[in-house]
Structures are given as C-alpha cells and as structure tokens.
Amino acid sequence: MKRTWWHDKVAYQIYPKSFLDTNGDGIGDLRGIISKLDYLKELGIDIIWLSPIYKSPFVDQGYDISDYYAIAEEFGTMEQFEELLAEAKKRDMYIIMDLVINHCSDQHKWFQKALADPEGEYADYFYFRKGKNGNPPSNYRSYFGGNCWEPVPGSDKYYFHMFAKEQPDLNWENPKLREEIYRMINWWLDKGLAGFRIDAIINIKKDLAFPDMEPDGDDGLASCWRMVENVEGVDALLEDLKNHTFAKKDAFTVGEVFNIGVEDLPDFIGENGHFSTIFDFSAHMLSDGKHGWYDAPPISFDAWKKAITDSQMRVQNVGFEANIIENHDEPRGVSRFLPDYAQNALQHIQICGFRLNFAWVYIIIG
C-alpha cells in the first residue's frame, strides 16, 4: 500500500453550530474554532472536519446549500475562514469540509432559474418529469419520508429529491452541471482546503427511467435506496469527479458510501480508488431501529466487536475504512452504549478510553 500524507493523522469532526459561540448569538462560529486550535492540537488532532458552513436556509442543518461559494453569516465571513486555514497551517493541521453535491437547496440560483424556465438550460441541472394520470412519476420514498417527487406549482411536472423537498437532486448526467461542481471544488482546494468528507455521494447515479418498484411499506412507496442499489454506472461518475478535482490536488477524501461489496472495495479505496477512505457503517447499523436511531435495539458487544473486526479484516490488503461510532445524524454514542443510570462524567471518560484502546487494536491499520 502506497504511503500518503494522511495515513498517520487523527481526524476530529466539528459541528460548528454547537462548538463555541464567541459573539453571544447562541450559535457557534469560526472565531470559536480558531480560538480552540491550540487545544485541539494539544489533544493530538491533525485533521479537522467541519460540518457544513456554506450559505444555507438550514432546513437540513446546512446540508441544503444555497451558495457553494459563500460562508453562512451565522458562522462568520470568508475572511475568517481564510484565517482559520492560515492558523491551522501554522500548527501543521489540516481543514476539510463537508461536500454536498448530490443535491442543493431549493433556494440555490440554479433551481430558482429552473423553476422560472422549466424548459431552459437550468432545468437540466435537476430531474423534472411529468406526472402519471395526476400522480407522481414513480413511487419512490425519500430518505426523510414521503414521495421523492414534489409537484411544481402551476405545472404538470414534478422534481426529484431523495432527501427533503427543499433539497432537489442534481443531475449528474449533465456535463455542464459537472463542470460547475468541479470548478467549485477546485476553488476551495486552491484556497488551501485539504479535502472533503463527501456527503451521500453514492446517490448521484439515477435510473433515468425512474421505474415503479414493488412497495415496501404501508404507504405504497418503495425506498429510493433500492434504485441506487440496482443502477449501474456510478463508478464512471466518481472517477470523473476524482480526476477533475481531488487527484490533481492530492486531497484527502472520505466518501459516505453504503453497502459496498468486498469485490468493489479496490474501486473505492484501493491505491487508485475513487476516495482516500470511506466510512464503514456495519457496526453502526446494529443500532438502527425500525424508526431510526432513536428507538435503537440493545446492542450485543460480541456482535459489535465482530462487525468492526470483520470490516477491518476485509480491507487490510486493500485500503483504509473508517469505522463509525457516532456522527451528526443521530444521538450521542454514550446514549446508545450506556444505560441511563451510567450516563455520568466518570462513565463517559471510561467509554472514551475504551474506544481509544479498541480503535488502536481494531481500527488503525498499518
């Protein structure tokens, strides 16, 4: 395995909104992150992953981006972000950001132009389809519930969204759209960003026929994930993305990718893979209840240990996988791993120590 600059680095996710507020408005900000760089460095952190700080209506906590080139004023200014990059560099630290390019906000200028002219250039940046006999074009359920197709007011057309209706999916089959995305990514990398955590990226390839599927719920809908599982061609899009952006800058990338078979791992995280690494959700999914993370079933330690061990064994000769304990999508890990009576400061420290030891044995490779 070829040695790269990020192999011996420790990464830390910051959710800026709740990290540190320095101006008293109740929202964490870039100044707060800058003020804690020395502390983070002392902890041994090398790479800081920032959850979205782009301009956004915040329907989905910033994962609905209305301007890819602007910092949300709630967090600060572009000048402050550039200061963060410079101060991190002084400490031999690296900044990566969330990259949300499966979809954007319905407030983004592209989508607003598409709505204004459904037959125009920008309509092809998204997926617009006519309904069928007064119904949506197909019976797909979005990840957030409800139909993936949202009616366009005053029209017989619908637009497609796999997440919230305020997050229309971008049409990756359109080369003009891809050029816009690549230009934006390179703009950030040229500023000194070290890379990206790439959100929901496996969803960018669609079956353009959008065929109906057998319902898998009482609502008569079928999970949109089943389309993603069955469609082919995502590798070509991911390789094009890498070659036009990340590969040219030696950027560190973490793909949010689900359900990849062992035979596909080299394509995703091999020496010439699409990404530097991907998240491994196998242990994480053990606590996925019928209604998501908030009704998680009891976790068997043996099953959890086996899931992590198996995931690391399958990639040891291929590349790196990042096991997940918790992230921004669900409750804190301590709420899942500890019973209510044990959720105190001492137990929190002990489980953090356990995680560190466990990570060293089972997660760190090479």
Protein language model annotation of sequence segments:
Residues 1-366:
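Active-site and adjacent substrate-binding regions of carbohydrate-active enzymes
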